[in-house]
Amino acid sequence: LILAAVFIPTVFMTGITGLLYQQFAVTIAISVLLSAFNALTLSPALSALLLRPKQPARGPLGRFFAAFNRFFDRVTEGYVNISRSAIKRAARSMILLAGLTVIGLGIGRILPRSFVPNEDQGYFFMQLQLPDAASLQRTDAFALEVEKVLAETEGIQSYTTIAGFSLLSNISQTYAGFYFVQLEPWDERGARTADVIMRELNLRLRERPEGLAFAFGPPSIPGVGNAGGFDMMLQDRSGADGVEYLTENAKRLIEAASKRPELTGVFTVFRADVPQLYAGVNTDKVYKLGVNVTDVYTTLQALLGSAYVNQFNRFGRIWKVFLQAEPEFRVKAEDIGSFYVRNEDAEMVPLSTIVKADPSVGPAFTNRYNLFRSIEVMGSPAEGYSSGEAMAAVEEVAKEVLPADITFEWTNMSYQEANAGGAGAVFALSLIFVFLILAGLYESWSLPWSVLLTTPIAIFGAYVGIWARELDNDVFAQIGLVMLIGLIAKNAILIVEFAKAELEAGGKTATEAALAGAKS
């Protein structure tokens, strides 16, 4: 009951953090029900079959049991003596308990914070980035060179190459591509973890003249973003017409963040000066020649891009029909002259007479976040730093270098981490629930304190263990702390219940009953 009670407050937590708590709560609740069923039904029956009168053990096994019993008796006596000393010096014991509580809370505050630890999931991604407006043929050629490096790397089982699409921006681009790299099973790789392999690949590929290629891990929780590390959106609230102002501030932020020791690999896939062709329609000529403007834009879209026509059934399948010009007829800007549009007199008018393509530069895409024009900035914590420390460093840099009309919002996994607060409130509510249940069980407001006062020592030990192992105070550690509260309360209840029964039976003082409970 106590184990289930400590997880009741987690039902009110929102977001992915709440889901993680709730899943663990369901697991604990079902386990407690199965344990209770076993204790009330199977255990008594098995005890009747398995228990035998005590007989002196003989042989090597008997000597082992005798030695173990002597050792256990000495440990028990030592524990009882410590308990007796603590009872005699109650004031000092309470001061020590208060000191351990303060130290434990202090260690908890200085522990590095993170959301969910990065794990070796058996795969990772790679991103290819060539010069802006590079052709798909150049991207394919570079991808083949990178594949040779992947084939030579130990620990990689297979890989899938997709050229012409950026995984980080989710945009189709001829000068981008990505890999899905599947690693060998964990037991076959040994010490070659995913992080080791990614670092090795990044070192081998960082100075390639053809373009940029780098490896990055997946998000800790599949489906929450496309990459690990931190992810933020810079928002332009100035109302500027173009992206130049936002781009300038994004560069300032990345430059300043790259100098922080907590951060590594800070970048953005946004480019504001990608070579483009601007197709301008001469509306005066359009009306003079009797051409419908809508037909002009529809023809450009269908032949230079693509247009969905219809679908048909054949061979038991549904086939979709798309209209698009052959690649060799849409290579150069002059190829627009090969396309025609019909005017009011049913005459075919070449598009080159009413459309002029001029070279220009501009962004390949623009993002909108909270309805504001935005740029996505990504990065990773440096080695030895947690994601919480990295996000705090980014926030400090943003406050220093960004003007008031450029704001930022966390997104994907970083958004979940930034909104994963409330662990302290959950711990407090868990303790309150345990206290109320014990107060109802013992019909006393004082006895539950003897159970609850054991939890600070347990939390102190847990925080010391996390600190000694140089781990992060993440969601899993917090779930473990809630679980620890329930386990410690359960053990304390057994001791208090036995001591209470001894005291009510008569013949023993409160101190003797407490020592009997400790010895039991």
Task: Locate predicted features.
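Transmembrane alpha-helices and their membrane-interface boundaries in multi-pass membrane transporters
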Residues: L1-F12, L19-F65, Y179, I457, ...
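Surface-exposed amphipathic alpha-helical segments in non-transmembrane regions
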Residues: G106, I110, F125, R138-G164, ...
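N-terminal membrane-entry
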Residues: V26, R373, N419-F433
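Signature of alpha-helical transmembrane segments and their immediate interfacial
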Residues: G62-F115, K519
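Hydrophobic transmembrane alpha-helices and their membrane-interface caps
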Residues: I8, F12, I30, L34, ...
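Membrane-spanning helices that line or support transport/gating and their immediate boundary helices
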Residues: L19, L40-L49, I82, S114, ...
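Transmembrane alpha-helix boundary/anchor motif
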Residues: F12-I16, F37, T41, A45, ...
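Transmembrane helices with small-residue packing motifs
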Residues: V11-L20, A98-A134, E188, A215-F216, ...
